[in-house]
Regions:
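Generic structural signal for small/hydrophobic residues in well-ordered secondary structure
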Residues: 7-8, 45, 85, 109
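Residue-level signal for well-ordered alpha-helical positions
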Residues: 16-17, 48, 88, 129-130
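General small-molecule cofactor/ligand-binding pocket signal
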Residues: 36, 75, 132
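Charged phosphate-binding loop/patch that engages nucleotide di/tri-phosphates or the phosphate backbone
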Residues: 111, 115-117, 121-134
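Active-site neighborhoods of divalent-metal-dependent phosphate/nucleic-acid chemistry enzymes
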Residues: 57, 69-119
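Acidic active-site catalytic centers that drive phospho-/nucleotidyl reactions
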Residues: 6, 44, 102, 120
């Protein structure tokens, strides 16, 4: 299975953080799965590090390097991902969600036929089969 990791799952996996859910850990460790990270996550961390360097421990460049060292594969943003963004649906009455990075990651997973691994409680409200909450 091709797994695209949400930014927080990516960071928790790289840091061996105790917040990484066991299900996510098992999926990442499964040798039958290919693990992907997105340039969208690199972009997100770059912005957060620039705005709050005391709260975000590394730069986007460092995150990309850690991902490569871990053997994770990159997914670069392409036009078809932006077009997929226009097709994402959200459940009626769902709580508000305004994170453009999350939406683009979902669009990438959808466009690339990947499973998107997240621990964000707001994301399962998107009616997209690619989302796997852990």
């Amino acid at each position: 299975m091709n797994l695209l990791l949400d930014t927080h799952i990516l960071i928790w996996a790289l840091n061996e953080d105790s917040r990484l859910p066991e299900k996510a850990k098992e999926m990442i460790m499964d040798e039958d799965n290919a693990i992907y990270y997105s340039t969208v996550s690199i972009w997100e961390i770059s912005i957060k590090h620039a705005n709050h360097p005391d709260n975000v421990e590394f730069t986007g460049k460092e995150l990309a390097q850690f991902c490569q060292e871990a053997g994770f594969l990159p997914v670069e943003m392409r036009d078809k991902h932006v077009f997929a963004l226009e097709t994402i649906t959200r459940a009626e009455g769902a709580p508000p969600h305004h994170d453009p990075f999350d939406r683009m990651l979902i669009a990438q997973a959808k466009a690339e036929n990947m499973s998107f691994i997240t621990h964000d409680a707001l994301l399962p409200y998107y009616e997209e089969k690619c989302i796997i909450p852990v």
